[in-house]
């Protein structure tokens, strides 16, 4: 591929990077020169980091952060984190080098499969429903499952992304929001499709994506076939008003309508607006369950499996408390 030892490039060491799968530590030896890849995966990380670091500098995506570090002297775990950050801040422009596109696709596909396998390859249709796990009666008990774990490992017709109005991902390296994680696992193809959608809005004289709707895209390297994006309400200071409740309910209705109308068999839900958008989880959970129940009552023939994905045990407990009440 004509790749040579990279020059010393600015390393954004002050930028927090997302967590990545653990890599056996490689202790750098200042007298040994460049670190040599030991596996095909490390070789792929090496060439991709070089390519996207050079791409970022050439296009002005990154500022100079001292001190300059030669990329091939970084341990591979650090290079992978750096690559994650470079992809996070990268605008949705084409990847011109076909070899690099193929290498990136191969890396992301392998990592996504490994993440799913480590999580037990969860399948939305195979998860026990609330009737079994929590004794919930009616349509809610028969159609809905509650799962604790990483939404991006779920095999489903679609998973839900809590997007912002620009629809291009979080763009902040290391930020742990679901928007960032979904784009990181899915890969640049997702941002490119979202950019195309937003370009269409701009051509029609429309602005940011409104709150309370749903947009369907491909899933790319996610186990899920699609992503349903929704922009939730922003709650300042944790004070929930009627308009916030109305808009959050609209998000979930739009998600379920989109899944049903598209003919999906299942959808994995994240907790919309409860992160950086400030909606208290304890107030959101009962509203989510109520909205799902009302939607199921209005669609008695639906066979849609709905999986509520709780990120942590604490989040799961919030939903279980709402179910108990």
Show the residue positions of the predicted features.
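Macrodomain-like recognition of ADP-ribose-binding/processing modules
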Residues: 2-325
